[in-house]
Amino acid sequence: MKINLFFVFLFELLHFVAAYSCEGDESAAIEAMNVLQVPYEKYNTDPVCAFDNSTVVELSDKTWDHVIESGKWFVQLTAEGCANCTLGELLFNDLSHAFHEKYPDVHFARVYLSSSLELSVRLLISRIPSYYFIDNQNFYRVSPQVLPKNKAIALYEKDGFKSMKKEQGFFSVNGPLKSFYWVFGKALALYGHLSQKYTPLGMNVAIFGISAYIMYRSSKKAKQKQAAAAAAAAAKKK
């Protein structure tokens, strides 16, 4: 319990100091780094920029598809209340400023999975924090070890993160099961929302029915597209 309260305190401090911009009070930012026990000199991190998240867009289940549909995005998937996540946020903020100056076409985004259950399923998140570099819907998993800005910039200049693991194959984020992940993520998010209002039995029945309906509609649309494509192909032959 004491450990949990301690991390809550650290995150409250983190968001309080985040009011500083990159031109803010460096001594206050350094003091906060020391309280959080972050070796900013080891990571060559600018303490002030590390607490400034103005160049990072916060996304959620509702905004993800509308934003990450084109362009280059470096995305952090994290949660509140863990030590590794705190360090990851600081390094990610600092990195976003470095990229903003050198490569303004690369956008940075953050997702808090505790309030975005759908994305935790759709993006196959098994550990936090996790990172994706998305280049026009091509997903690359980025290792947290690459996060310090010197390493990240050097790697991006070398091959644009293309040496990172690309998500491809049957079970991947962009694979044939993409629609299933979407449906299951929707169901899980809805389940979490309804769990605050209704009994478990009622929720299970409702979620099952809704999931079955969504899958039926998705299957029906897919068949309609296939039929239309077949008809178009037949018309061309004539």
UniProtKB/Swiss-Prot annotation:
Query: What is the residue range of the signal peptide feature?
Result: 1-19
- UniProt cross-references to InterPro entries, sorted A to Z: Thioredoxin-like_sf
Provide the transmembrane region boundaries. 198-216
Q: Where in the cell is it found?
A: Endoplasmic reticulum membrane
Q: Which residues lie on this side of the membrane: Lumenal?
A: 20-197
Instruction: List GO terms (cellular component aspect).
Output: endoplasmic reticulum; endoplasmic reticulum membrane
**Which example biological process does GO assign this protein?**
protein folding in endoplasmic reticulum
Coiled coil regions in record = none
| Coarse class of the protein's main subcellular location | endoplasmic reticulum
> What is the topology of this protein in the membrane according to its UniProt annotation?
Single-pass membrane protein
Q: Which residues lie on this side of the membrane: Cytoplasmic?
A: 217-238
**Does the record's keyword annotation contain Transcription?**
no
* Protein keywords: Endoplasmic reticulum, Membrane, Signal, Transmembrane, Transmembrane helix
Query: What's the superkingdom here?
Result: Eukaryota
Key word Repeat present in the record? no
The name of this protein is Uncharacterized protein C777.12c
- Species source reads Schizosaccharomyces pombe (strain 972 / ATCC 24843)
